[in-house]
Amino acid sequence: MMVDFFNNIEVLPGLHANGELTLGENLADHGGLNVAYLAFQNATKDAPLGVVDGFTPEQRFFLAYATLWAGNIRDEQIRVYTKSDPHSLGRWRVNGALPHIQAWYDAFHITPSDPLYVAPEKRVNVW
């Protein structure tokens, strides 16, 4: 399921991500994100955090994850990395991971009309 999801990502016109090459790292991102979110929930359960700048603690957790992978990369490097790197490009470490995390849907009230929405039966749920 995850291989197909990433194989369908067009990173540049005519160039798709390689879900087979990146499978191990994509699964690691998925698992790590789930474990990190559980740790976040555990760390804040006795001292809940408030809304800051209009964002809930849960939203800020996912925004921090997305910010970690933000960056600019030239098309030439996208081509090289897509063909040789077992890690997905930063953009897809975010936009490829979050749609498989139910807590992200809950935090941002994601619905079927939102661009990154993935139907529950098509989401990867390893943990």
Can you describe what each PLM-predicted range is?
Residues 1-127:
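Zinc-dependent metallohydrolase catalytic domains
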